[in-house]
Amino acid sequence: MAGGSLAPAGVAKERAEQYQGKVTFAVFVACMVAAVGGSIFGYDIGISGGVISMDAFLEKFFRSVYLKKKHAHENNYCKYDDQRLAAFTSSLYLAGLAASLVAGPITRIYGRRASIISGGISFLIGAALNATAINLAMLLLGRIMLGVGIGFGNQAVPLYLSEMAPTHLRGGLNIMFQLATTSGIFTANMVNYGTHKLESWGWRLSLGLAAAPALLMTIGGLLLPETPNSLIEQGLHEKGRNVLEKIRGTKHVDAEFQDMLDASELANSIKHPFRNILEKRNRPQLVMAIFMPTFQILTGINIILFYAPPLFQSMGFGGNAALYSSAVTGAVLCSSTFISIATVDRLGRRFLLISGGIQMITCQVIVAIILGVKFGDNQQLSKSFSVLVVIMICLFVLAFGWSWGPLGWTVPSEIFPLETRSAGQSITVAVNLFFTFVIAQSFPSLLCAFKFGIFLFFAGWVTVMTAFVYIFLPETKGVPIEEMIFLWRKHWFWKKIVPGQPEVDDSRESMEMGEAVASRIK
């Protein structure tokens, strides 16, 4: 029996129907500004691959790789196999991993805005250090500061978006973070394509321009309202209700406000959320917080995003062609996010994840076959096969962009109860950054060892994650964020694990139904 066979409409439907509100200008602006944090994340993902393909950058910081690229006659797949070079990319994510664990308590105690502002300031410092780097130590320190910014931003922004958005549009608005991320990746690709021609100092401009969205994130964080959930959790009930009325555009927010009060009362009774999250009743959310970000990285998307120009060069593309091809894939990724925004709250999370997984598997297998048959040490891809590889990679990126890209963040951010929400998001970010670090550090060596088989390696993982979603992930579309507990209690598998008193829940639903009917009669 598939995990999503139960329609979410049966989960606290009566309570959810009492929620009122629309997408107001206030909530739209707040979500747009908050999502800028995603653009910085995307920019840092996309910029590294282009920078490490620039000769001036390699000659200054990684001369051995520069000489290997220029003069060595060896396996095409091994041109960039250097652990110090990999550390330039991966150090950012290791720092982000550590920062995300610190960001959890800060986000809970001081609010979502505090973490957004902290992330923006860290980004500014990191961008300045990278742009002015005179040695490898300064370069890596800048990447570490960028990582701290990612740890704070990725912890707070998805939470902020989930809590500000109306229930019926939560998925679409939450994906604003992914849209900003993909826009940042595309922007980085275009910047690299332009600065590649500036030779000696182009890489400095590429790295330094990260300061622009970082400044927007910092200023925006100072101007944004705090989420009503966070204000209520801090005991500011009246202020929380005022913000809720403003962002919903109505005074009739009693049902949603009461859910927030109930959740806050429980949250404030929990003194150790990281310990609480290990309890049996939180097991489904914990499993999703670990597996969703793990699987997102194991799609293999980061081999395209981090190393697109070097990867295309390894396949025989010239320098300009490699940067151009990576810019094309960045544009496809950015545009694909609009598909997810338009469909996630109509078709649901499960449909997008499963169909996207099938498309990614197909594309990766085709690329592996082409490279295995037509490309090797003494072979170069013909123009027609090169174009076919780029098309297949674009179709792979397209599928990721409307499935695992946004939903790998959206699903974990919307399933936790308030008392463990910050802790849960910290775990999601930490797991994501840990596996991002592992893939970023090991990919050049994996590419050298597996050759074309690297695509089959990731295709195998996509097969596993697609089956996982089909079996274990219930549909969260249309379920109020504070009512997710009913979803797990009625799921065919998780109801065997999650303790509870269904009869109490059922009576609560019956009472709410009666109240709703009575109010209509009046």
From Swiss-Prot:
Source organism of the structure: Ricinus communis (Castor bean)
Subcellular location: Membrane
Disulphides: none
Homology family: Belongs to the major facilitator superfamily. Sugar transporter (TC 2.A.1.1) family.
SUPFAM superfamilies tied to this protein: MFS general substrate transporter
Membrane topology recorded in Swiss-Prot or TrEMBL: Multi-pass membrane protein
Protein's UniProt name: Sugar carrier protein A
Gene3D superfamilies from the UniProt entry: MFS general substrate transporter like domains (1.20.1250.20)
Spans through the membrane: 23-43, 87-107, 121-141, 144-164, 173-193, 205-225, 286-306, 322-342, 351-371, 384-404, 430-450, 453-473
PROSITE patterns, alphabetized: MFS, SUGAR_TRANSPORT_1, SUGAR_TRANSPORT_2
A Pfam entry, by short name: Sugar_tr
Any one GO cellular component localisation term in the record: membrane
Database matches in InterPro entries: MFS_dom, MFS_STP/MST-like_plant, MFS_sugar_transport-like, MFS_trans_sf, STP/PLT_plant, Sugar/inositol_transpt, Sugar_transporter_CS
Domain of life: Eukaryota
Keyword line: Membrane, Sugar transport, Symport, Transmembrane, Transmembrane helix, Transport
NCBIfam families: SP (TIGR00879)
GO molecular function: monosaccharide transmembrane transporter activity; symporter activity
Principal location: membrane
Cytoplasmic side: 1-22, 474-522
